[in-house]
Amino acid sequence: MKKIGLFGGTFDPIHNGHLHIARAFADEIGLDAVVFLPTGGPYHKDAASASAADRLAMVELATAEDARFAVSDCDIVREGATYTFDTVQIFRQQFPSAQLWWLMGSDSLMKLHTWKKWQMLVRETNIAVAMRQGDSLHQTPRELHAWLGKSLQDGSVRILSAPMHNVSSTEIRRNLAGQGVSDGIPPAAARYIREHGLYEK
C-alpha cells in the first residue's frame, strides 16, 4: 500500500527546519512521498508576507533535490479559507487506496478539536506529530484524551522522534528585512528571495 505524507504550511519562507522535519516524517513513517501544501488563505494563521505564487515557487525550488518530495498548489487555487479536512478529501479522491498521513506540530495537535470536522478528518488520515520544545502530550486538552489514547495504541497517530526545529519564519523574515541575512534558508529559495526582492523593508 502506498503511503503518502501531507505537509501543509504557509512556508513564508520555507526554511531548513521544514526540510529536516519532512525528511524525518518520510523516514520514520516509511513514506513513498511527502507532498508540501503551501496555504492559500489559511484559516488559523495571519496573512503571509509573500504572495502565494512566490511561496509556491520557493517550496518547489527548495524541495527539488529530494525525489520523495512533491508540491501541490491545491490549497492555493481554492478560493476562500482552506481547511485541512477539505485538503485531505482531495487526496483521498486522488489516491483512494493509499495510506494518508498528515504532519502537524504539537502546537496544532493541542488545538485539533477546534478544527473543522476534526473527527471526520482523523478517520480519513493518520496523524504524525512533531513535538515542539517544551510541549508534552500531558498538555493535550481533555476533549482529545479518549481519541489520542486509542490512536496512539492502534498506530494511527505517531509521535516522531525528531523534534520540530526551533526555527521561526518570523525571525527569518526579520533578519532578511533588517540585514539581508538568509541563514537557515535552502540556497535555491534564498536565491529566489534575493532575485525577487522579497521580505525587504
UniProtKB/Swiss-Prot annotation:
UniProt-listed GO biological process terms: NAD biosynthetic process
Pathway recorded for this protein: Cofactor biosynthesis; NAD(+) biosynthesis; deamido-NAD(+) from nicotinate D-ribonucleotide: step 1/1
Keyword hit for Cytoplasm: no
Enzyme class of the recorded protein, top EC level: transferase
Keywords: ATP-binding, NAD, Nucleotide-binding, Nucleotidyltransferase, Pyridine nucleotide biosynthesis, Transferase
Recorded GO MF terms: ATP binding; nicotinate-nucleotide adenylyltransferase activity
Enzyme Commission number(s): 2.7.7.18
Catalytic activity: nicotinate beta-D-ribonucleotide + ATP + H(+) = deamido-NAD(+) + diphosphate
InterPro entries registered for this protein in UniProt: Cyt_trans-like (IPR004821), NadD/NMNAT (IPR005248), Rossmann-like_a/b/a_fold (IPR014729)
Family assignment from sequence similarity: Belongs to the NadD family.
PANTHER family registered for this protein in UniProt: NICOTINATE-NUCLEOTIDE ADENYLYLTRANSFERASE-RELATED, PHOSPHOPANTETHEINE ADENYLYLTRANSFERASE
Function field: Catalyzes the reversible adenylation of nicotinate mononucleotide (NaMN) to nicotinic acid adenine dinucleotide (NaAD).
Name of the molecule in the record: Probable nicotinate-nucleotide adenylyltransferase
Lineage: Bacteria, Pseudomonadati, Pseudomonadota, Betaproteobacteria, Neisseriales
